[in-house]
Design a protein with these regions (language model features):
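Flexible loop and strand-edge segments within Gram-negative outer membrane beta-barrel domains
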Residues: 258-259, 263-267, 283-340, 346-370, ...
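Short, acidic, small-residue-rich periplasmic hinge/interaction motif at the N-terminus
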Residues: 6, 20-22, 51-53, 65-109, ...
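Short acidic/polar hinge/loop motifs at secondary-structure boundaries
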Residues: 154-184
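Gram-negative outer-membrane beta-barrel transporters
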Residues: 426-430, 540-544, 562-654
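Transmembrane beta-barrel wall of Gram-negative outer-membrane proteins
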Residues: 223-251, 261-297, 316-334, 375, ...
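Outer membrane beta-barrel strand-and-loop segments of large Gram-negative receptors
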Residues: 275, 360-376, 414-417, 509-515, ...
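Outer-membrane beta-barrel translocator/receptor signature
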Residues: 174-177, 182, 187-258, 265-272, ...
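Conserved C-terminal beta-signal and adjacent last beta-strands/turns
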Residues: 270, 277-281, 317, 331, ...
Length: 743
């Protein structure tokens, strides 16, 4: 099949347009003549998606062999839009779900030093920080393993969700795109649909034939850390095989804040992978390997002030992840079954937390494996639609050692079966999913302590479900609702921890009697999609029974937060449960009053409350908004804007009758008189930002350079979700420069 892409206004060929055929899982880029050619395609209906920086994305439904030669026209637009269907608008396989997708120019502008930093600022998404590296995404107030982070659809196999000082072992610079999935489709990946799923898409294993060498090279620098990041990817044919090679590295020094240099925030990181597959019109089979290493610091002090319980010499984390993956898919020529696919991985993970002089305080080791088998189908007739059924299995063996560690070894086994379906009736679309999860956790160390009793095996199992409905009104308006019932088993750490965690400044104690969380969520949402107006808004209410959280333990003698029994240095946090309610709103509006000029505004707000006491839940993000004026053409872009972060004064009450402070003073109050960060309010801030970018096609290669200036006013501000906020503010003024060459 031959595809020609032209500019809708000038009718000239458009170079470097990314074309994808979803059903065939093939991707191509147009050359100097605006053409691309696809081979080994199945006959029947195919969905072609065209994306190019500076143009509105476009979707076209094709029918082979009739549409063997196709011409499509792209319209210049500065708006961040979903792909617009221009043929068969009422087709039965159209999908709608509340998702966020970052790719192209939007990904370049947002690209940060981590996945969480890249997504922060999107509606409903913020990040929890413990320095510039140890960050984690928070979706609608939920974090940890309530938010699944995947790489090409499989879990990473790291321990990022177990503590705030642990980093996600996936780099955003080499991602093709990053998706956030909510609603019924999230049940294809996990049982907790109240949070969400973040999928970093790279396609390590090529899924389609490759007929020529393609790739991308990236180089990024930033002033706040004097950091440099580089990366490259190439996909090439080697005989009958498709090969993909990728690598990236990062070298950054300590971060600069308006209050001075923040020690122990430097980082060195490498990431490399290679994938090989055989691919044809009926599917593919292949494998890949990847190696990720990182050494980074966790800040504990600034300007002579040290967080109570922190090591004066700082903490460094040294980690390595090695993973292998097999991936395959078969697509029948005809029938209701459209594909049968499977993927499995084996991951070896090691992490050491180093004190002054390279002394190992804690060492983690984990071996994990998972597999997924999915059958996708399509129906025709009165109940036309599509869906998927599948099975999933996971095994995880986590060990810990060190001079005095509170993390206990355990083995986790899990199995799931799930299904998802969607159908349409003219303007009405219905979507639903169901999943059953069984989880078994066996501790390998059962010795009780003063604070941890009744250590034993635990088994959990339950159903999760989600349903959604959308209705298309005139004038490009779509309204809908979704209802979800979610299940989450307690994590290993929540059950069995019993000791200090140096890099998170806490003595953490689990609770082997914890019950599984059970949540019920309701969403109401609306979307407007017009040529010069794009808007979406959502109201949500999530009620969680037996919500698990870490709370400071009160010392019965003093009324102050309890300190660890050995050194009386760390605040003791213990896993607790309470009925919780999380409710809020989020939205985004984009308006293009003049061609190429866009006003863009987003707002996110969430409130967490214990339903039994009506007290606020700890570690809830404040409301956050973003406004931006953007000018974008196919050749250049520019923007100015502001991030507005609200004050967070809605915090859990301090222990009754306690006289303590939230301020850390050099040589002042004793450590025991300083309240933990989650019991302290945080002021708001307004951060100005600006960006400019240039794109040129030279010798059939797209060159793009983007400059972004964050925190233009060098404002001193603090992150409410960081346990070290009383000591250290966030980064100051930062100039980021990104260069990409696509070939």
């Amino acid at each position: 099949m031959s595809v020609l892409v032209v500019d809708a206004q000038s009718q000239t060929p458009v170079v470097a347009v990314q074309l994808t055929l979803g059903e065939a899982e093939q991707a191509r880029a147009t050359g100097n003549d605006g053409r691309a050619r696809f081979t080994s395609l199945p006959m029947g209906k195919l969905t072609l998606v065209a994306r190019r920086l500076g143009y509105a994305p476009l979707t076209r439904v094709l029918q082979l062999p009739r549409d063997s030669v196709v011409t499509i026209q792209l319209r210049a637009s500065a708006m961040s839009l979903s792909a617009v269907t221009v043929q068969g608008a009422a087709r039965s396989d159209a999908t709608f779900q509340p998702t966020t997708v970052l790719d192209g120019a939007a990904l370049d502008r947002a690209l940060g030093t981590s996945i969480a930093a890249t997504l922060a600022g999107e509606p409903g998404i913020t990040q929890r920080t413990n320095g510039p590296v140890a960050t984690a995404p928070i979706i609608r107030g939920l974090g940890g393993d309530r938010v699944l982070v995947l790489e090409d659809g499989l879990r990473l196999g790291d321990i990022a969700t177990t503590a705030p000082d642990h980093a996600i072992t996936a780099d955003a610079i080499s991602a093709r795109r990053i998706e956030v999935i909510r609603g019924p489709a999230g049940l294809l990946y996990g049982s907790n649909t109240l949070g969400g799923v973040i999928n970093v898409i790279r396609e390590d294993v090529p899924r389609a034939p490759i007929d020529r060498v393609t790739g991308v090279m990236s180089l990024q620098g930033e002033s706040v850390t004097t950091g440099v990041t580089g990366g490259g990817m190439a996909a090439l044919p080697v005989g009958p095989l498709a090969v993909r090679v990728e690598g990236s590295w990062r070298d950054a020094r300590s971060s600069q804040t308006p209050a001075g240099e923040l020690p122990f925030t430097d980082q060195q990181q490498t990431d490399a992978g290679v994938g090989v597959s055989w691919a044809g019109s009926r599917g593919h089979i292949g494998s890949s390997v990847r190696r990720f290493t990182s050494e980074y610091g966790v800040p504990t002090s600034l300007g002579g002030l040290s967080l109570p319980g922190a090591h004066v010499g700082g903490i460094y984390v040294d980690l390595q992840r090695t993973s292998g993956r097999v991936d395959g898919e078969y697509r029948p020529r005809s029938g209701a079954v459209t594909s049968i696919s499977g993927a499995a991985n084996l991951v070896s993970f090691e992490q050491s937390e180093l004190e002054r002089g390279g002394f190992v305080g804690t060492r983690f080791g984990q071996l994990s494996s998972q597999g997924d088998l999915v059958m996708r189908y399509r129906r025709s007739g009165a109940l036309a639609g599509q869906g998927a059924v599948g099975v999933f299995g996971q095994w995880r063996d986590m060990r810990a050692a060190g001079s005095f560690t509170g993390t206990r070894p355990a083995v986790l086994r899990a199995a799931s079966v799930y299904g998802y379906d969607e159908m349409g009736f003219d303007r009405l679309r219905l979507m639903g999913g169901v999943r059953y999860d069984a989880v078994e956790i066996a501790p390998l160390e059962r010795t009780p302590t003063q604070l941890l009793q009744d250590v034993r095996d635990r088994r959990f199992g339950n159903w999760s479900g989600s349903a959604a409905a959308t209705y298309a009104l005139p004038a490009g308006i779509t309204v809908g609702t979704s209802v979800a019932s979610a299940f989450r088993a307690p994590a290993i750490e929540e059950l069995y921890s019993a000791g200090p965690h140096l890099a998170s400044f806490a003595y953490e104690v689990g609770n082997p009697t914890l019950r599984a969380e059970r949540g019920t969520g309701v969403d109401l949402f609306a979307r407007v999609a017009r040529q010069r107006l794009s808007a979406e808004a959502s109201l949500f209410r999530n009620a969680v029974t037996d919500f698990i959280y870490y709370a400071p333990v009160q010392d019965p003698r003093t009324g102050l937060p309890l300190r660890d029994p050995r050194l009386r240095r760390y605040v003791v946090y213990q896993a607790a449960q309470a009925p919780a309610l999380l409710q809020g709103a989020e939205g985004r509006v984009q308006v293009e009053p003049v061609t190429g000029w866009v006003g863009d505004a987003t707002l996110s707000w969430v409130q967490g409350t214990r339903r039994d006491t009506r007290d606020p839940l700890p570690a809830m993000p404040p409301w956050r908004g973003r406004v931006q004026l953007r000018r974008e053409t196919p050749r250049w872009l520019a923007s100015v804007g502001a991030d507005v972060i609200g004050a967070q004064t809605r915090i859990p009450p301090a222990p009754g009758g306690v006289s303590a402070t939230c301020t850390v003073v050099r040589g002042g109050e004793a450590e025991a008189d300083v309240l933990p960060a989650e019991l302290c309010p945080t002021p708001g801030a307004t951060l100005l930002n600006a960006s400019v970018g240039l794109r040129r096609v030279i010798a059939a290669r797209l060159h793009a350079i983007t400059l972004v200036l964050d925190n233009v006013g060098d404002v001193l501000w603090r992150d409410h979700l960081w346990r070290a906020k009383q000591v250290a503010p966030q980064s100051g003024r930062n100039l980021r420069v990104l260069y990409r060459m696509t070939f």
